[in-house]
C-alpha cells in the first residue's frame, strides 16, 4: 500500500505496456497538492489498461482542496478566528463538507425561490427593497479595507447580472471598481438588486466567513450545530 495517487502512478508506470494495472483506493479523502496528470506514460496497449477505482463505490473522494489544521479563538459577536501559517488564496470555504458563504450584505435568506442572490424573489417592477442599499455611501464609510471584495448587481433591465472586484477606495471614499463587462449590452447597476461580499464588516450571520490575507487570519461565524474544536475545514 502507498499513501498518495502520485506514488501509485509512479509504481504503475514501471509495469510493461502489456500488463493490466489495477489501482485500488481505500475509503477516505485524497487531497491533491498539485494537478494529477495522466500522460502517454500512463497508457497501455489496446489489450491492456490501467484502472483507478474505489474499493467501495461512493466511499472515496479525490479533492483539489486543502485541509487546514487550525487553532480557533473565540472573539466578539460569535465570530471565531484562526491564523493560517501558509500564504493562501481562499475562493471557497468548506466546513464539515458544506460550502459556506463569504461575509456579505444583504444576507442570504433561507428558503426556496429566492432567485436573486439568494435574497430576493425576482420582481420586474421592484423599486425599493426596504433595506439599506448595499452601495450606500454610509455603508461604504464603515468598511475599513474593502479591497478584494466583490460587487454583484443585476443589469438595470434585468438582462442578466454583472460583477466587479473592489480595488480599494478613491480619495473621496467611494469605491474603486474593476469589472462590469459580463453583459453584452452594458448598463448601469440595478437600483435594488445589489449585493456585496468578502467584506469583513459584513460578517454577521452564521455560516459566513472572511479571510484577511494581510494578517493571514480566517474569521468565521459558526452554525449552532458546529463545535469549533471539532470541525473539519477545507479551502479551495
Give the ranges of each region predicted by the language model.
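Extracellular polysaccharide-degrading/modifying enzymes targeting complex plant/algal/animal polysaccharides
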Residues: 1-236
Amino acid at each position: 500500500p502507498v499513501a498518495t495517487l502520485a506514488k501509485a502512478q509512479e509504481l504503475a508506470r514501471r509495469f510493461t505496456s502489456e500488463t493490466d494495472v489495477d489501482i485500488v483506493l481505500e475509503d477516505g479523502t485524497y487531497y491533491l497538492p498539485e494537478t494529477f496528470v495522466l500522460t502517454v506514460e500512463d497508457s497501455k496497449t489496446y489489450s491492456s489498461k490501467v484502472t483507478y477505482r474505489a474499493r467501495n463505490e461512493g466511499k472515496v473522494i479525490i479533492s483539489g482542496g486543502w485541509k487546514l489544521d487550525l487553532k480557533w479563538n473565540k472573539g466578539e459577536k460569535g465570530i471565531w478566528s484562526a491564523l493560517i501559517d501558509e500564504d493562501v488564496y481562499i475562493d471557497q470555504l468548506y466546513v464539515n463538507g458544506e460550502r459556506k458563504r463569504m461575509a456579505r450584505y444583504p444576507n442570504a435568506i433561507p428558503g426556496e425561490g429566492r432567485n436573486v442572490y439568494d435574497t430576493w424573489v425576482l420582481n420586474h417592477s421592484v423599486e425599493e427593497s426596504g433595506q439599506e442599499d448595499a452601495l450606500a455611501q454610509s455603508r461604504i464609510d464603515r468598511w475599513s479595507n474593502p479591497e478584494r471584495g466583490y460587487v454583484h448587481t443585476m443589469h438595470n433591465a434585468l438582462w442578466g447580472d454583472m460583477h466587479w472586484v473592489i480595488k480599494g477606495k478613491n480619495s473621496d471614499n467611494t469605491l474603486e471598481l474593476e469589472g462590469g463587462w459580463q453583459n453584452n449590452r452594458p448598463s448601469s447597476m440595478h437600483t435594488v438588486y445589489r449585493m456585496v461580499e468578502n467584506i469583513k464588516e459584513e460578517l454577521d450571520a452564521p455560516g459566513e466567513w472572511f479571510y484577511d490575507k494581510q494578517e493571514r487570519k480566517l474569521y468565521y461565524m459558526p452554525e449552532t450545530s458546529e463545535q469549533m474544536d471539532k470541525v473539519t475545514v477545507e479551502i479551495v
